[in-house]
Amino acid sequence: MNASISLLCLALLLISPFCLGYSDEERESDSLRVAEIIRTSNDAESKINRTQELLDIFRRLTPTLSPEQREKIERSIQEHTDEILIDGVPSQGGRKTKYVGKILSPVAQGLAVGFFEELGGSLSRLFTG
């Protein structure tokens, strides 16, 4: 009995790295998704509405980035997003764009579109190396 439990634990330890993390397939899927988002977002409204999806992709990609890469993109994100608070405490990885679902002045709309283009470009460069 003790040997079977030990064997089971060993098997779980060997298998668990394959179940966790960001796989090559997920990375490829996100890379294609970023390219599609950038390619099909032709007007300001679609860019603003799809910014949150780019933020979600960045959140999934974050563990695979170097601290320098992560810091560079996070500085830009913090300028253009609001922190999600749950009971007054920041949510883990919880940021949302400031711009979705709001009526924006032309200046704010320009900022939102610029943020979309900056974030999309940064993600695209990360995927293409």
Curated annotation (Swiss-Prot):
Gene Ontology BP annotations: cellular response to heat; cellular response to UV; innate immune response; response to bacterium; response to heat; response to oxidative stress; response to UV
Subcellular location: Secreted
Induction: By a variety of stressful conditions including bacterial infection, heat shock and exposure to ultraviolet light.
Top-level taxonomic group: Eukaryota
Role: A humoral factor that may play a role in stress tolerance.
Protein name: Protein Turandot C
InterPro entries given in the database record: Turandot (IPR010825)
Organism in which the protein naturally occurs: Drosophila melanogaster
Signal peptide: 1-21
Keyword Secreted carried by entry: yes
